[in-house]
A protein has these predicted regions:
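A mature extracytoplasmic/lumenal domain signature
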Residues: 53-55, 97-99, 132-134, 145-148
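A short, hydrophobic beta-strand-centered structural micro-motif
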Residues: 46-49, 83-105, 177
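Short aromatic-glycine motifs in intrinsically disordered, low-complexity regions
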Residues: 80-82, 86, 117-118
Length: 195
């Protein structure tokens, strides 16, 4: 009986510590929906990008993260083409997405006070830094930030950063990408430069 209880507790603690950098909740950034922009295909701009992630994820996770980025840009239907650099395009983007767990002394004190037996919610911060350059020479830098929470138990202390492809983390990243696209739209990066 006690052995089953210990096994269940260990399983739950392991699952919670391996959950990643998000809980089933929305981030703090307002959820963005891309409106339908009535542009003819020949008027849409093409995009060439480089994207990196900090801290660097494992190769398989990085491939999934890049696919997620491309899918969100394709789903928006705002661009004629999106491809990784170096490709001739109307818009060139350099994107860096960082993820960090912001543990404060308060979190550590709470962890010590509970003896690691109580889950502690710590903030996980996503920051998207993008440098956008159009073929007309216009350059803009964007810094977009969002935050979600991570539950930490004794086996998960100190909390680290893992790039998980779970639905909540993915939702937060995708919303960052949509926010970037809306800011690009506002700043006039959606039109084809012409020949």
């Amino acid at each position: 009986m006690i052995r089953k209880l210990i096994v269940k507790f260990a399983l739950i603690a392991t699952l919670l510590s391996a959950w990643g950098c998000a809980l089933p909740q929305e981030g703090l950034l307002p959820k963005v929906e891309i409106p339908a922009v009535p542009l003819a295909a020949e008027l849409k701009s093409s995009v060439s990008f480089t994207i990196s992630f900090l801290p660097p994820p494992a190769a398989e996770a990085e491939q999934k993260l890049v696919e997620e980025f491309i899918q969100e840009f394709e789903r928006a239907n705002l661009f004629r083409m999106i491809s990784s650099a170096p490709t001739a395009a109307d818009v060139h983007m350099t994107v860096v997405l960082t993820q960090a767990v912001a543990v404060t002394p308060k979190h550590f004190a709470l962890y010590l006070a509970t003896g690691g037996l109580s889950p502690i919610r710590v903030p996980c911060i996503y920051e998207l830094h993008a440098e956008i350059r159009s073929c007309l020479g216009k350059e803009v830098k964007y810094d977009i930030k969002d935050e979600v929470s991570k539950m930490v138990w004794a086996p998960g202390w100190p909390p680290g950063v893992d790039w998980h492809i779970d639905p909540t983390s993915s939702s937060v990243r995708r919303n960052l990408y949509r926010t970037l696209m809306m800011q690009m739209h506002r700043d006039g990066f959606l039109h084809h430069c012409g020949e």
